[in-house]
Amino acid sequence: MAGQQKSVTLRFLAAPMDANVRGYVGGGKILEWIDKAGYAAAAAWSGHYSVTGYVGNIHLHRVVNVGDMVEVEARVVYTGRTSLQVVCTVTSHNPRDQVRVTNTQCLLVFVAMDSDGKPTPVPPFEPEDDWEREENERAQVLTAVRREVDDAMALQVYSEATETCRETLRFLAAPTDVNWGGKVHGGYVMHWIMTAGKLVAERYFHGHARATYAGGFRFYRPMYIGDIVEVDARLIYTEGPEMHVSVYVRSGDPRGTELQTTTHCTIVYTARDEEDGEVPVRPWVPRLPEDRALERHAVDLIEIRSRLGRNEPHEPHAD
């Protein structure tokens, strides 16, 4: 029954096929898990199919190792008229020692849809304990911050007038990428974004880079099976060991000529040495006007997000 179940927990072992080329489970796969758990919680509370609108403020604290027992807990913390905000917490442990670590925590926004694909009202959520009250209040603060970030993003130009390190992936959305609504799964889109961003970071650094923060995946429109997909990633800012990479996803009918923007995110990667310690990267010094504007934009986003005031997870039932 809608409005009754407010949390869902997925439990499973991280499999060898989940690992990246470095042998551990990277941020892209973790985001796939998060999107699935978040969808389950949103659908259970709303009683409707729900689409991902936003996934953000993602601090990737620790990697998941192959063979770890993984728990992805998704909890509804706030509702609007047709939207739901869900906090997802990912923890993992080696089954042989039971020492649990928190890998990441983030906020997702879903919109409930009726049978005609239109937004539909959801049952109101009322927090019942200290953790829920704090997350409910924080969700409202994050909504205001997202609007400020959206306004800043709308002013930026991404064209061919650039000298930065840039990579573009192109492929067709396959039937295996489908979600429960017949469109491309948002978790897979996030995985593609993380892959393209990592490619740019490692090409620029000429070494290993790990995703440590994602500033917000914004989903503007759905993507369909059979669409041609273009994932365009470019470096926009460096500081110390950090490389800030902006990624746009566009898609469209391969028989047509125009691709439409479906998703955008900015990801922070850190350069790592052979012992997995952080090392500085050579500074990116932009010369062209567009590149300089995007560098200023990255600095502005850092300032806006600094007001969020929390980098560590706030685990459920920790109070």
Predicted regions, residues:
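Catalytic strand-loop segment that frames the active site of acyl-thioester-processing enzymes
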Residues: 1-26, 125, 139-192, 199-200, ...
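HotDog/MaoC-like acyl-thioester-processing domains
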Residues: 3-10, 64-66, 77-147, 225, ...
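Hydrophobic beta-strand-centered segment that forms part of the acyl-chain substrate-binding groove
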Residues: 2-5, 25, 38-85, 91, ...
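Generic structural detector for well-ordered beta-strands
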Residues: 11-14, 59, 109, 170-172, ...
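Hydrophobic, helix-prone linear segments
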Residues: 1-73, 99, 177, 283-287, ...
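Hydrophobic face of alpha-helices
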Residues: 31-35, 190, 194, 244
